[in-house]
Amino acid sequence: VLACGVVLLALFAPALVFGARASDDIPWHFIWLQSYLDAVRHGELYPRWMPDAMAGMGSPAFYFYPPFATMFFALVDMIFLHQLPLAYVIAVSACAMGLASAAFFYSWARNFASVRVSALLGLAYAAAPYHLLTDYYNRGALGEYAAYVWVPLIFHAAHRYLVTAGVRWLALLAAAVTGLFFTHLLSAMIVGPVIAAYVLLALFGRQRRGNAGPGITVTLASMVAVALLAVGVAGLYFIPALTLFDAANTAALYARPIEATRLFARLSVHDNPVVTRYTLFAAIYLALTAYLLAEYLRARRRAAVAPAGLGTSGATVLMWTVVTALCGLFMWGKLGFVFEAPSPYRSLQFLSRLLIVVEFVLLTLVAVVFAVLPAPAERQRIASVLLLVFAGLLVYQALALFKKFEHMPIAVNEVALSPRVQYRITPPEYYPKGAPFASAVDQLLPQLAPHLDASEQAWIVDGSGRIETVAQSHGDFVLRVTAATAVSVAIRQFYFPGWVAQDQQGRRLPVTAATPFRFATVQVGAGTHTLRIAREPLPVEGWAKKLSSLSLALLLMVLGALGWAARRRASRAAPAMSPATLNRSR
């Protein structure tokens, strides 16, 4: 176990030495962490609007992007007393997430395999190339990267509940499900069906073997109720995100059709390196799955398979194989109807995301195969093949990391100094809807040039008048306007639902997006006006908060009731103590 931890830390050495560096999404996480820390300093623990983003013109990113990763970064920043540069806060946080994912997969694998095998599988899970090299080092997709933490924990909690009927495992299941939905909604969407399939298969297998414990109906109802309530707790995040999805420039998410991301096509190391790399990973995983299935079937024909336990039956082995095969077909672009409108999986964006499932399933299959094949010769042969492949993947990643960091200076972080981070330019999907903005930052900055470093926080858009005074604090504006005619007043914040305006007499005024750049704009008549323009929570935020609170209360009640019922069953099942035994116990 210690050796596996050392290897994993070695793979994180570049991150810990250089900090978070250039990758696809890392700039966003710099920006979001900066904005989140600013919001916390203003007393907001879960902000939705980022008034300091987009060069101080505001962004709704926190309405849509899951909050867990950013909040975890902020926690790490607090633990280090705000002394670490943000690049190292993110790197240390990612390392902690990687270690946690390894530990949780180890716990999951221990249901089937030995300590040594489980430790190696935990290392392989944390250092799997899509997980580590792609999601952290190359893409910087830290929400998706963090989702790897929760997946084995969900399976482990569900499995232990099926084995022991212990309510504490249901509580852990609820926490992990809520965590996954707060971390990465797309990962929850693709992992959810696999979790459901495993639970149903294991539950019916337990019933056939006649295992003691609550009946199948009670067990299934308990797990479904807890899972649904756990999802409801996360409604605080995803209900506003889904409800307001069309209020931002979210069409930018689908500028590239999902069909164009299929693997096993247009392969070229030079012309299409990303798809080629993902295809290599997928091909290796599919080949290993086929090999493990062949070894299992060979042993089964010779009746050299250990008696099946929960999660180690032939049906379970087949299920893991089918899941990997289906993911392979999906990534190849087959069965494309699954990703066509109105399917929610249309929002997956990249078919390569299914590698999240494939890496987990393959390593789980390894643990199961080692559990059911007791012959030392077979185990040795399988271990040799797997170690050879995994060692090759580790070497591949080490070489890729060496190439990435070979000439990179430690003292200068190009991400932190980039104009995108300096001006906190958010991804295009969070631009104001309908604004004629370029997605490339080098084209966007000239468009925003008149407002980038402007001290002007409000101005007259239409009509005759002037702004006498402007006071602005974290997106809350107070203006004094003198108008000779009716005027339209714009503030230096982009429009998004939630802006409200009020004059000195307490009358509410409508806020619109009346300018080409979609700045929040208020119309007032002739005269002198004192206006307060600020954001207030949208009704959907209130509904989401109430649903989340109600779900949490019901979840605690359900867990409490199930715990009480379990203790009552245990007390009834306990044999009565004889008087002599009772006296001795006293």
Please name every model-derived segment:
Residues 40-41, 123-126, 325-327, 332-335, ...:
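A generic short-segment signal for beta-strand/edge and adjacent turn/coil regions
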